[in-house]
């Protein structure tokens, strides 16, 4: 028999020969085997098997059909079918509308299915909820008859928990898994009842879940799968003690997952303590600035910063002054509705229309946000603002106005904007350069892939300018320079006039400057290498030239004027004030300056000589491109391991570049054709991040991976600036000893606290005895974990959805003065009248409305009285 033909390498579909064997329609058709099948059809003998040729032909036809399918590209990516999910779950995923997994799902789902602990960094809207819900349903599969919850999902807020519950129900549509919701604000008795129905999945907030655990004495030894969703928000909201207590009660064999938008230091420490050999999932593409984002850097003076902002909005972004068209249309429709006019047909919803000039301005502190929003409103721009401790309702209203197009500008702090999904597809403007490259990538590149064309504008101060050289995917060829003074002066004068006329604006500016000084003292400082690069950059004459974006607008006369002003600004007199007019005299001050000048000249000569020797020997100062990993002395320096300007394959990057000036004696030993750098190219890191097989090879060491991904943001208000230098202990007069200041912050000061199983302090009110009273009143017996489920408990299951209650309101009976509780009952009746309950709904007064019969009867009585009393009156005698 002839040897078997090799299987087609490009095949992804299994071949079904049932129709051919059963004599179907396709079997009756003659076979047409073409010469170019893409496979090996040489069987070695003339009497080869017809079945093998038939299978090969059908397989080749299937390959051609898949290759020629419309909308398919040559590069094939694995879908949900390649992850080994069950049929019911795949059907639910298809009904949900998911076809291709997102990058975070492509990397996280296989690792979670393997049983590894995972720390995933993903922004809101990246599909992270499905990334941990799909493996959870695949692992739990069906409802277990044994008592005990097997999956727990922790959410920071009630709204996010409800959203997660909806996703779990949609993906678990084909299973009988029981899911309950435990959040604050709901009835404890109803949640007691839900916990006795043996749920498989618990979606809860940490505070309420810990309350039920302590109150009911829950045994969590059956938990196999726990997820901390939005883990950074959990720590920010003060749930660290609750999470530690919950984690201590879980078995060691559990699988723990953390998903977060950022990775603060506290979260890294929690992951190291609570997770076993975790794998960090972080796509390098999310730490890059989008190639669709055009960047421009402007050097400005501190005093001209606000004027430069007005100038950029007016002349670069071309933002009009006044209310938006969407706002005018919405106001017109509101006026028409108030006048009783109908809405015009086909006008559409004006709140759905985007604004072309949508701009986002990032600031450091909330005081700066308040000042900028007030300044821009005074300049005539519609502005929304968001900062950290803004009320949730006010924050939603501000963001809603910006998304609806009622405002053109959103002023926001870095803390409030973290993980926030921007709905705009137009440029965003950034007022200040952040303190780290990670923060800049998070703020500037968060929604880059969704932009048709973006514009990032960063006014740069000299001490922070070198940070941009360390950015991945942003070469140093990005243009930089100062603004044209003749265009900047009117905007600066406008800001000065506003400050002169508005006293409140001056007060806001003073508070903002004080807060910014506090921010400068508490933020992370730049490394020594960054300081050296900043000094080298500041000494470059091109750094102070007019930006190339404004060169076309400058005429020859204006350019000559600017050049003259630049020369005047850079003028250095040959003599100091101590030497003027004192030549030839024996002045002590002049003699000191002459000696000082000799020492300075000697030092300059030595530096120039050393620099010339370094260039002649091919040695230069270590920069971001040639610095070894062990010499990178800050978190910004550690990110330089992914190449900078050496990546030549990034052809899709959209930047406004300027030609480099060739410096003699620098990098002359490096050949573009033969030189091989030890640094990995940029596309290598991108392909490694998106890879499915072997994608976790670089994340085997969580400590080193988390060190590069860690990002702790400085608070945006003054109260949080001094936390780093705040004393950790205080003297307690009552106990006569030093105690931790955490006692003042966790609620234990002046309140009763108890120690949990993990040693953490929890509120004593968690153990109030309400569950024991409820259990006795309802005669419910709690089953132990591991026992078989009682058959009568399944009928009482509630998934945490709405429960229907009667809404009957009964008013109390009238008070009886002969009873002992007369005064108490009278008070209840009075309260019912005030609240209009029951038959007091229309008020407690007597109903004075008369019916027709009563009115008719009263009229007849009045007529009879008139007839009877119609006799003339007696005359009075005086």
From Swiss-Prot:
Helicase ATP-binding domain segment(s): 109-281
Comp. bias intervals (Basic and acidic residues): 809-870
Q: Where found, per UniProt?
A: Nucleus, Nucleolus
Disordered as annotated region, ranges? 332-354, 517-536, 601-666, 726-758, 787-878
Keyword RNA-binding (UniProt): yes
One GO BP on record is:
rRNA processing
The Enzyme Commission number assigned here is 3.6.4.13
Which Gene3D superfamilies does the protein's record reference? Answer: P-loop containing nucleotide triphosphate hydrolases
List residues of the Helicase C-terminal domain.
349-538
InterPro entries in alphabetical order: DBP10_C (IPR012541), DDX54/DBP10_DEAD-box_helicase (IPR033517), DEAD/DEAH_box_helicase_dom (IPR011545), DEAD_box_RNA_helicase (IPR050079), Helicase_ATP-bd (IPR014001), Helicase_C-like (IPR001650), P-loop_NTPase (IPR027417), RNA-helicase_DEAD-box_CS (IPR000629)
Which segment of this protein is annotated as the motif DEAD box?
229-232
Query: From what superkingdom does this record's organism come?
Result: Eukaryota
Where composition is biased (Acidic residues), the residues are 627-638
Motif annotated as Q motif, chain positions: 78-106
Q: Summarize the protein's role.
A: ATP-binding RNA helicase involved in the biogenesis of 60S ribosomal subunits and is required for the normal formation of 25S and 5.8S rRNAs.
What the record says about family reads: Belongs to the DEAD box helicase family. DDX54/DBP10 subfamily.
- Put simply, this protein is called ATP-dependent RNA helicase DBP10
Native organism is Phaeosphaeria nodorum (strain SN15 / ATCC MYA-4574 / FGSC 10173) (Glume blotch fungus)
């Amino acid at each position: 028999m002839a040897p078997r033909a090799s299987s087609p390498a490009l095949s992804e579909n299994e071949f079904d020969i049932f129709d051919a064997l059963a004599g179907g329609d396709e079997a009756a058709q003659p076979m047409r085997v073409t010469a170019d099948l893409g496979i090996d059809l040489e069987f070695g003998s003339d009497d080869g098997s017809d079945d093998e040729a038939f299978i090969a032909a059908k397989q080749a036809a299937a390959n051609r059909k898949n290759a020629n399918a419309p909308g398919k590209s040559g590069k094939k990516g694995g879908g949900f079918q390649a992850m080994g999910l069950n049929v019911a779950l795949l059907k639910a995923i298809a009904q949900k509308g998911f076809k291709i997994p997102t990058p975070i799902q492509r990397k996280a789902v296989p690792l979670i299915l393997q049983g590894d602990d995972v720390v995933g960094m993903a922004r809101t809207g990246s599909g992270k909820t499905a990334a941990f819900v799909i493996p959870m349903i695949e692992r739990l599969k069906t409802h277990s008859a044994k008592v005990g919850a097997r999956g727990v999902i922790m959410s920071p807020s009630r709204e996010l928990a409800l959203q997660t519950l909806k996703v779990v129900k949609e993906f678990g549509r084909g299973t009988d898994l029981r899911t309950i919701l435990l959040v604050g604000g709901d009835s404890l008795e109803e949640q007691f009842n839900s916990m006795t129905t043996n749920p498989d999945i618990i979606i809860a907030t940490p505070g309420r879940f810990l309350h039920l655990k302590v109150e009911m004495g829950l045994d969590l030894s059956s938990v196999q799968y726990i997820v901390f969703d939005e883990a950074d928000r959990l720590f920010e909201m003060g749930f660290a003690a609750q999470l530690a207590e919950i984690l201590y009660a879980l078995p060691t064999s559990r699988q723990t997952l953390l998903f977060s938008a950022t990775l603060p230091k506290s979260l890294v420490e929690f992951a190291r303590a609570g997770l076993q050999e975790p794998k960090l999932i972080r796509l390098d593409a999310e730490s890059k600035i989008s190639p669709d984002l055009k960047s421009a850097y402007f050097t400005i003076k501190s005093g001209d910063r606000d004027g430069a902002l007005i100038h950029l909005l007016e002349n670069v972004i071309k933002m009009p002054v006044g209310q938006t068209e969407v706002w005018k249309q919405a106001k017109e429709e509101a006026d028409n509705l108030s006048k009783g006019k109908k809405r015009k047909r086909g006008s559409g919803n004006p709140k759905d229309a985007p604004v072309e000039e949508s701009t986002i301005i990032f600031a450091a502190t909330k005081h700066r946000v308040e000042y900028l929003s007030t300044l821009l409103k005074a300049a005539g721009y519609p502005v929304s603002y968001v900062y950290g401790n803004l009320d949730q309702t006010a924050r939603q209203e501000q963001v809603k106005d910006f998304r609806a197009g009622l405002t053109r500008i959103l002023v926001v702090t870095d803390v409030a904007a973290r993980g926030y999904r921007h709905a705009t597809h137009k440029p965003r403007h950034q007022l200040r350069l952040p303190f780290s490259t990670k923060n800049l990538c998070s703020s500037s590149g968060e929604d880059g892939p969704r932009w048709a064309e973006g514009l990032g504008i960063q006014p740069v101060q000299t001490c922070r300018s070198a940070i941009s050289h360390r950015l991945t995917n942003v070469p140093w060829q990005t243009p930089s320079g100062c603004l044209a003074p003749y265009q900047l002066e009117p905007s600066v004068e406008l800001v000065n006039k506003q400050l002169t006329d508005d006293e409140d604006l001056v007060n806001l500016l003073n508070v903002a400057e004080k807060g910014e000084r506090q921010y400068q003292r508490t933020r992370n400082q730049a490394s020594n290498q960054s300081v050296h690069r900043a000094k080298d950059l500041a000494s470059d004459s091109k750094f102070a030239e007019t930006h190339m974006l404004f060169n076309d607008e400058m005429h020859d006369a204006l350019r000559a004027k600017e050049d003259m002003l630049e020369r005047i600004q850079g003028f250095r007199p040959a003599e100091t004030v101590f030497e003027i007019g004192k030549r030839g005299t024996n002045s002590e001050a002049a003699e000191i300056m002459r000696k000082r000048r000799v020492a300075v000249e000697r030092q300059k000569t030595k530096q120039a000589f050393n620099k010339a020797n370094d260039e002649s020997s091919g040695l230069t100062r270590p920069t971001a491109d040639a610095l070894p990993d062990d010499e990178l002395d800050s978190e910004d320096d550690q990110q330089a391991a992914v190449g900078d300007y050496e990546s030549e394959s990034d052809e899709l990057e959209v930047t406004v570049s300027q030609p480099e000036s060739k410096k003699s004696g620098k990098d002359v030993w490096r050949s573009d054709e033969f030189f091989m750098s030890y640094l990995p190219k940029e596309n290598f890191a991108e392909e490694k991040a998106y890879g499915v097989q072997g994608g976790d090879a670089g994340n085997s060491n969580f400590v080193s991976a988390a060190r590069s991904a860690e990002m702790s943001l400085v608070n945006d208000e003054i109260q949080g600036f001094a936390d780093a230098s705040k004393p950790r202990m205080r003297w307690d007069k009552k106990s006569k000893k030093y105690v931790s200041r955490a006692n003042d912050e966790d609620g234990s000061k002046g309140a009763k606290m108890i120690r949990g199983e993990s040693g953490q302090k929890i509120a004593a009110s968690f153990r109030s005895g309400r569950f024991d009273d409820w259990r006795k009143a309802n005669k419910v017996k709690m089953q132990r974990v591991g026992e078989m489920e009682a058959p009568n408990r399944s009928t009482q299951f509630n998934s945490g959805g709405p429960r229907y209650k009667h809404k009957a309101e009964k008013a109390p009976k009238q008070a009886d003065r002969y009873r002992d509780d007369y005064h108490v009952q009278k008070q209840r009746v009075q309260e019912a009248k005030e609240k209009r309950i029951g038959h007091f709904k229309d008020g407690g007064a007597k109903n004075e409305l008369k019916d027709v019969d009563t009115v008719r009867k009263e009229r007849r009585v009045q007529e009879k009285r008139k007839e009877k009393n119609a006799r003339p009156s007696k005359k009075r005698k005086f």
